[in-house]
Amino acid sequence: MIRAEAPERRYAILAEGWFARNHAKTAHGLIRYGRDEIACVMDSTLAGKRVSDVLPDLGRDAPIVGTLDEALTFSPTSILVGLAPPGGRLPEEWMETLKAAADAGIEIVSGLHQRLAPEFPGKPVWDVREPPGDIPLFSGEGFGVGPKVALTVGTDSAIGKMTATLEIERAARGQGLSTEFVPTGQTDVIIGGGGSASTP
């Protein structure tokens, strides 16, 4: 796994043909809750519009462009795969876009099961689902943690676990409580910039 050392990213979000749909939850989550800047969204079916025109409830705005060349004019540091496409593998056109981005020195960030680092050897790729090699075995040490812990779980994907957790955290902070979001899902890790999304 190669991961850029820059503490802050400026994202171009690749969501071709899907940005306005629920399946683009990684794109939506990063825009709504992420700390990093959004340079633009790439979806040629909505090119010329803005995020606020299409999904005003996300609370942040960015231009929507149709091509990588247009995206590069907004000086992104990273290109995010903004959804998991049906079938779990990226279409060839997306791979071509990612290759061109990598060749331009743009970091690729992906939460897919499909590992992208082997596809782009020597290029900056953050495969979010690639677990770090130093995860210890369960020891029970967590039972001794002083602060209260709220665990959110669900029986399926894309049902609101992350959204509920982040809204609870937001409300708690609004009441002056000290809170920390510990991400475990791929979108959560991208939003928080750390954690573990180790689902193989």
Regions found by a protein language model. Give the residues of each.
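ATP-dependent carboxylate-amine ligase catalytic core
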Residues: 3-10, 24, 32, 49-56, ...
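Flexible, glycine/proline-enriched loop segments at strand-loop-helix junctions
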Residues: 107-112, 151-159, 198-199
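Glycine-rich, highly charged phosphate/nucleotide-binding loops
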Residues: 55-72, 93-94
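Extreme N-terminal, non-catalytic leader segments
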Residues: 87-91, 97-149
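Redox-cofactor binding/interface segments in oxidoreductases and associated redox assembly factors
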Residues: 80-84
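Short internal beta-strands
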Residues: 37-45, 109-112
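Walker A (P-loop) phosphate-binding motif
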Residues: 135-181
